[in-house]
């Protein structure tokens, strides 16, 4: 895992800057036209879910990107670990790693928003953090509207997210080159 971080530092930097830029741009443009902080927090929460869904699907499809050339395949297969350990390391790297990366990007975008807040004439309510509202939205995540308990709706929402994520993870295991587009094309058929 350490080898992946060191060899792919530029790719990891780009995968961090993408969510950071998305959060920062959404916070910037939505705060210019908003007067209600709750609407602003809902937009930031929606952006967080969108980044997790689309970015998570994209990174999951590159679970075995270390095997996209023959030389990289040989190098990866020669590592002193079992196949399960290698896959588990890559799985954690692209799933849990991306969630942590997105959360850190959201935190840094929030800090950047606080640093740039004195430059703009915004209402006093915007001088509070959106992170508690984002956390509350994460805990109450619902994709379907059906009669039942709120906990069950939240579980169904997260299971839907994991189900879609697993398709892209499976596509990343099947195809080494252009796995995201091939998996997306197969899902759309």
Model-inferred region functions:
Residues 1-74, 83-189:
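Hydrophobic alpha-helical transmembrane segments of membrane proteins
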């Amino acid at each position: 895992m350490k080898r992946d971080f060191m060899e792919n530092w530029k790719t990891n930097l780009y995968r961090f800057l993408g969510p950071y830029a998305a959060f920062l741009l959404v916070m910037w443009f939505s705060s210019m036209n908003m007067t209600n902080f709750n609407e602003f927090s809902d937009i930031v929460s929606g952006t967080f879910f969108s980044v997790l869904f689309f970015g998570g699907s994209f990174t999951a499809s590159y679970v075995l990107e270390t095997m996209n050339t023959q030389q990289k395949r040989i190098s990866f297969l020669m590592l002193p670990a079992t196949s399960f350990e290698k896959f588990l390391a890559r799985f954690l790297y692209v799933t849990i790693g991306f969630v942590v990366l997105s959360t850190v990007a959201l935190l840094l975008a929030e800090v950047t928003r606080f640093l740039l807040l004195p430059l703009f004439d915004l209402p006093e309510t915007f001088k509070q953090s959106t992170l508690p509202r984002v956390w509350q939205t994460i805990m109450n995540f619902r994709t379907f509207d059906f009669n039942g308990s709120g906990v069950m709706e939240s579980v169904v929402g997260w299971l839907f997210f994991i189900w879609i994520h697993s398709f892209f993870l499976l596509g990343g295991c099947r195809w080494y080159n252009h796995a995201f587009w091939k998996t997306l094309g197969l899902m759309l058929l």
